[in-house]
Amino acid sequence: LILATMTKPWETVFCTPMAHINCDECNAPEFYMGGAKLTLVEARAAKMTPESLRKALDNEGNRGVHGPQRGPVSITTVTERGTIYSLEEIRAISAVTKEYGLKLHLDGARFANAMVALGATPAEMSWKAGVDAVSFGGTKNGCMGVEASVIFDPTLAWEFELRRKRAAHLFSKHRFLAAQMDAYLEGGLWTDLARAANAATGLLVAGLQGRNDIRFAFEPQANIIFFEAPRALHQRLLGAGAVYYVEDGDVTAGDPAGILTGRLVCDWSMTPEAIDQFLSLLAG
């Protein structure tokens, strides 16, 4: 809905190939944007660069009435691969975005995890870096069914309210869910939860490092780990009761030595005991 508020139907939103809005929303962004499209920007470790963004921007919006016009840029942090945009990287993306007269959206489903990992403030990671709107996550950090939309332009914020109502996202008694956001933000609870999740991930990373049968696919920078390991190791872990997603192949059949990628996520409630239990399974 934020993107729909920022995008005209004949425009295109610039995002990375693995962006949630491209891979995991059942075409909802295109639907709510009235048919606007997504243009994929080349990424490294799930992050676009100023250079790759500029290239994508130059390839769109130059065909007059025959092609899509340039629309907002959308980035995600923590990214879908567990990496983080530094403040300098956000500012650099914003500079290119503003050079083309466009708006910058930040998908912050794990905003808190990225912020505490950087040691930044909410303002430093948003409007001070040139971000125009933030999808501020709650459900990935302890809330139940609650997210917040933070829009720094009052005119766009009012349009968002209308779009929320029209999209049936303003429903009766929702205040009983929305009330969580007050408690979430009060006294820094949201940052405490994120620090706990990141710290637990650090313990898990330390336990995985040094094994010659495991390699990190991406540098773990917050609370998500992608690790590459032989199929046989995944089979042993899952068979012993570990629960996690395995990507890029069938874990149940194939070469035991074939390398598959596992995805591990630590939340605010993860305990050292649970991590030790997983590492014990790993040790056999």
Model region roles, listed by residue range:
Residues 1-240, 248-270, 274-284:
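Conserved PLP-enzyme active-site core in the AAT-like
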Residues 244:
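FAD-binding core/adjacent interface of flavoenzyme oxidoreductases
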